């Protein structure tokens, strides 16, 4: 397997985990629908995601019990599917953010002045 393919796969998996953390972080403040989540993530270029890419992540997070959804009427169109974080999601977010920050700090100390 070529190095670029390995790097690409690693980046894809890394971003999936980051998107889960970002989505849960956004849902801590209020329930949001898919397009609203996508728009909020796009405000930070490193977290920009397409609408088509966010829905499989939301489905997976729902299946894991980290988020749940409900339908609500919209003033300007069909009903919207809102997502909200569960208690399990809150616990998972806290655990993973702590682990992420711990790992991030360790990597920074190892990389020295590389960045």
Curated annotation (Swiss-Prot):
Entry keyword set: DNA-binding
The keyword DNA-binding is assigned to this record: yes
InterPro entries: Metal_resp_DNA-bind_regulator, Tscrpt_reg_PadR_N, WH-like_DNA-bd_sf, WH_DNA-bd_sf
Entry GO MF terms: DNA binding
Source superkingdom: Bacteria
Protein name: Putative DNA-binding protein YizB
């Amino acid at each position: 397997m070529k190095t670029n393919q390995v790097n690409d796969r690693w980046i894809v998996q890394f971003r999936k985990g980051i998107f889960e953390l970002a989505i849960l972080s956004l849902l801590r403040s209020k329930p949001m629908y898919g397009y609203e989540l996508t728009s909020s993530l796009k405000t930070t270029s490193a977290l920009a995601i397409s609408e088509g890419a966010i829905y499989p992540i939301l489905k997976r997070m729902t299946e894991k019990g980290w988020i749940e959804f409900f339908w609500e009427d919209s003033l300007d169109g069909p009903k919207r599917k809102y997502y909200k974080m569960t208690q399990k999601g809150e616990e998972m977010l806290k655990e993973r953010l702590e682990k992420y920050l711990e790992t991030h700090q360790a990597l920074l100390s190892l990389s020295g002045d590389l960045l």
